[in-house]
Amino acid sequence: MSKKFAHTQEELEKLSLKELENLAASMREKIIQVVSKNGGHLSSNLGAVELSIAMHLVFDAKKDPFIFDVSHQSYTHKLLSGKEEIFDTLRQINGLSGYTKPSEGDYFVAGHSSTSISLAVGACKAIALKGEKRIPVALIGDGALSAGMAYEALNELGDSKFPCVILLNDNEMSISKPIGAISKYLSQAMATQFYQSFKKRIAKMLDILPDSATYMAKRFEESFKLITPGLLFEELGLEYIGPIDGHNLGEIISALKQAKAMQKPCVIHTQTIKGKGYALAEGKHAKWHGVGAFDIDSGESVKKSDTKKSATEIFSKNLLDLASKYENIVGVTAAMPSGTGLDKLIEKYPNRFWDVAIAEQHAVTSMAAMAKEGFKPFIAIYSTFLQRAYDQVIHDCAIMNLNVVFAMDRAGIVGEDGETHQGVFDLSFLAPLPNFTLLAPRDEQMMQNIMEYAYLHQGPIAFRYPRGSFILDKEFNPCEIKLGKAQWLVKNSSEIAFLGYGQGVAKAWQVLRALQEMNNNANLIDLIFAKPLDEELLCELAKKSKIWFIFSENVKIGGIESLINNFLQKYDLHVKVVSFEYEDKFIEHGKTSEVEKNLEKDVNSLLTKVLKFYH
């Protein structure tokens, strides 16, 4: 078959069912080929190939809003939308995004979960006000239905009666093992012993019944399917079709045409296999969700093994040690047990650590209640996903001044996932909150010390750490953690000082070493705490060093520069501050090293800028 992928509705309509199936197979090959080289979201995209093809065949992608929840199922859509020639650049610097992106022709940006139905509702309202006949189509996975926002939208959609199609991709998996009553609800009818035996009896009946009775028996079987799975949606006022085989193009196309003709809000419940078409990925929960480059034949990663432990692994081990030492430690993650390292604790202490699915707001508030009851919660969460629970952080933790620990993974630039996932805002949105303490480790030993301190600390506290490994290892001796105390790592008479925070200390040290090779020098401070700052040390520093460079992986606005300038103004100190934090723009995708170079935040670029201040 030609490697050209049909990408218009008209072209797809001309293909036979067999040709469409061949198209699906060739697309799977392409997705596997590209993801094996570039990394990406593999299993979820492989499971949604037929769904995307059917969407493009029944609806008009040029006018009907296609909304992909999270975008983990959008690769086939990209190929059908004419992106075949640049698909090899997926997730690469200046290449095709791994998520939906309006600048690439998609309807809406997506990277965080459970927004699709709300977007569909809003699109419905706009279309109605314009007097147009377009129909929004939202593709959402069963994992995304664990978030409350999806039900807020379904609640309004069912009451609105707008024409809208919600295509539910139920693969009985989210990123990790599915959690909660909703997941169980979606699968219970198909899993019951009664239904399975009933289905077998119907199959035997169909073999012996005359044609006239066969039709009625089939209709009876289909009606039985509706009793349990569809009840939730129908009670909300939505039409319901399914469950149907999400890999049977004929069934999907028929269901979409039926839903389109209804001119009402309709949920089509499809059941798919995550990782379909790549045997090594089928049936796996987390391993093949988001992957790096790998060998297609063996499934083994082709990335050179890093002998250094990741910051996540260090966090996980330290928390295990603390949990065995202090029985009042509890913890939670929102659908990212393996990503945050909390899976090890859930396995060892299932009554003290929980995965609550994609429910960041619930995660934070439930842990606030546990803190109120005398427990010490550790909330393990990606920096970018903490944004989803900001009100709960303020209302339920900060105002109450509760002893809650926020462990913010993936702080700083995270690479190929791009602007929806960069962890560069947490300092800016947490620093203004009264009662909050903020700090960051520079290396493994300091991570251990900070976590021990966080357990003992009174009040809400948050520490951030990077994706991957710490750059620094044992270049500097660790210090005891004391509230609001920094560590002076390199002390001399230079009028220039480097102030580092977290992973920024490593970048500052790399620049300083290059300067020392040129017979230049600078003071190096590990702030450790962003809030409160070590005012005593900084006042001493201001007497000798009049140029301060800030090294921190946060945006400038509300970051370390802002906090330092507030301090200088408070004491009427006159110091020139130069910040190497990120500018006021969203940071796009690409390998972290390439993104840093583009932003002129790599060591060579920073060194060039610093050298201008040496005479």
Swiss-Prot record:
It catalyses: D-glyceraldehyde 3-phosphate + pyruvate + H(+) = 1-deoxy-D-xylulose 5-phosphate + CO2. Mg(2+) binds at residues 142, 171. GO terms for cellular component: cytosol. Pathway: Metabolic intermediate biosynthesis; 1-deoxy-D-xylulose 5-phosphate biosynthesis; 1-deoxy-D-xylulose 5-phosphate from D-glyceraldehyde 3-phosphate and pyruvate: step 1/1. It holds the Pfam family DXP_synthase_N. Its EC number is 2.2.1.7. CDD domains: TPP_DXS (cd02007), TPP_PYR_DXS_TK_like (cd07033). HAMAP family: DXP_synth (MF_00315). Binds 1 Mg(2+) ion per subunit. Binds 1 thiamine pyrophosphate per subunit. This is 1-deoxy-D-xylulose-5-phosphate synthase. Thiamine diphosphate binds at residues 72, 111-113, 143-144, 171, 278, 360. Keywords: Isoprene biosynthesis, Magnesium, Metal-binding, Thiamine biosynthesis, Thiamine pyrophosphate, Transferase. One of its GO terms (molecular function) is magnesium ion binding. It is an enzyme of class 2 (transferase). The keyword Signal does not apply. Catalyzes the acyloin condensation reaction between C atoms 2 and 3 of pyruvate and glyceraldehyde 3-phosphate to yield 1-deoxy-D-xylulose-5-phosphate (DXP). GO terms for biological process: 1-deoxy-D-xylulose 5-phosphate biosynthetic process; isopentenyl diphosphate biosynthetic process, methylerythritol 4-phosphate pathway; terpenoid biosynthetic process; thiamine biosynthetic process. PROSITE patterns: TRANSKETOLASE_1 (PS00801), TRANSKETOLASE_2 (PS00802). Disulfide bonds: none annotated. Homodimer. Belongs to the transketolase family. DXPS subfamily. It comes from Campylobacter jejuni subsp. jejuni serotype O:23/36 (strain 81-176).
